[in-house]
């Protein structure tokens, strides 16, 4: 079983590390090509392209400039500990045991605009390059054209290595669009998280993102390997709703706190 999650815009390079082990990203040659393109952008161009403030654009221009092809624990940190968004609040990788990291390294992948696919312990230098950004490059007009089949092929390698054919899609639509489902040697299961608001169940972005992290943690902590085991997920009040679910979609609901 291979879990897919999105990266985060918020990064943490200050907190103490809970493991000293690390691996290197497997698609660094591709990342270096994107850095080459990104370095051509001025801060105002970055601000316009990414729809971010001038201050953030300056920070990210500096990140592109400072990026080096040689990754060390001094200039990078493990991806699963560097990302700090809603998904990662639910995941709480900073509390993982070494055995948890081992299982995650085999069964969890983070999709990335710059790095393509990251394993949890892959070192990552700070960056911001969302998958949906229209960064022109030698392979096309955006990052989807740049990555082509590369991400899908890398995921197929991971599935083959564990002798499995199930992908748990906990990534956002923006990131999962970088995967070619028809070329993926796997059944795709998508958990959906609905929260009650004013008597109706719907996707509330903040809660849904955190729930994707909670589900990832549930799979890792319990060493789950079969999709039917996911129906036991009950973190923070969620419950499985079989009637609303279908073959490829598992629906989890949570009642409004009253």
UniProtKB/Swiss-Prot annotation:
It comes from the Bacteria. One of its GO terms (biological process) is response to hydroperoxide. Transmembrane segments: none annotated. It holds the Pfam family H2O2_YaaD. InterPro entries: YaaA. GO terms for cellular component: cytosol. Belongs to the UPF0246 family. This is UPF0246 protein YaaA. The lineage of its organism: Bacteria, Pseudomonadati, Pseudomonadota, Gammaproteobacteria, Enterobacterales.
């Amino acid at each position: 079983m291979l879990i897919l999650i999105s990266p985060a815009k918020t990064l943490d390079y200050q907190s103490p590390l809970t493991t000293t082990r690390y691996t290197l990203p497997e698609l660094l040659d591709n990342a270096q090509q994107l850095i080459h393109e990104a370095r051509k952008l001025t801060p105002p161009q970055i601000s316009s392209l990414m729809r971010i403030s001038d201050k953030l654009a300056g920070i990210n221009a500096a990140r592109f400039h400072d990026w080096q092809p040689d990754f060390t624990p001094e200039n990078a940190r493990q991806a699963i500990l560097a990302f700090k968004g809603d998904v990662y609040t639910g995941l709480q990788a900073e509390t993982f045991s070494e055995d948890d990291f081992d299982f995650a390294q085999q069964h969890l992948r983070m999709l990335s605009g710059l790095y393509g696919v990251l394993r949890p312990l892959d070192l990552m230098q700070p960056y911001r390059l969302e998958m949906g950004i229209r960064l022109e490059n030698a392979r096309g007009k955006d990052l989807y054209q740049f990555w082509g089949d590369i991400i899908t092929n890398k995921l197929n390698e991971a599935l083959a290595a564990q002798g499995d054919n199930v992908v748990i899609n906990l990534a956002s639509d923006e990131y999962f669009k970088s995967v070619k489902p028809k070329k993926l040697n796997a059944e795709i299961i998508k958990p959906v998280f609905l929260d009650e608001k004013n008597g109706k169940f719907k996707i509330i972005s903040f809660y849904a993102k955190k729930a994707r992290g909670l589900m990832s943690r549930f799979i890792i902590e319990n060493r789950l390997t079969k999709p039917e085991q996911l129906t036991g997920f009950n973190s923070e009040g969620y419950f499985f709703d079989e009637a609303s679910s279908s073959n490829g979609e598992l629906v989890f609901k949570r009642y409004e706190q009253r």
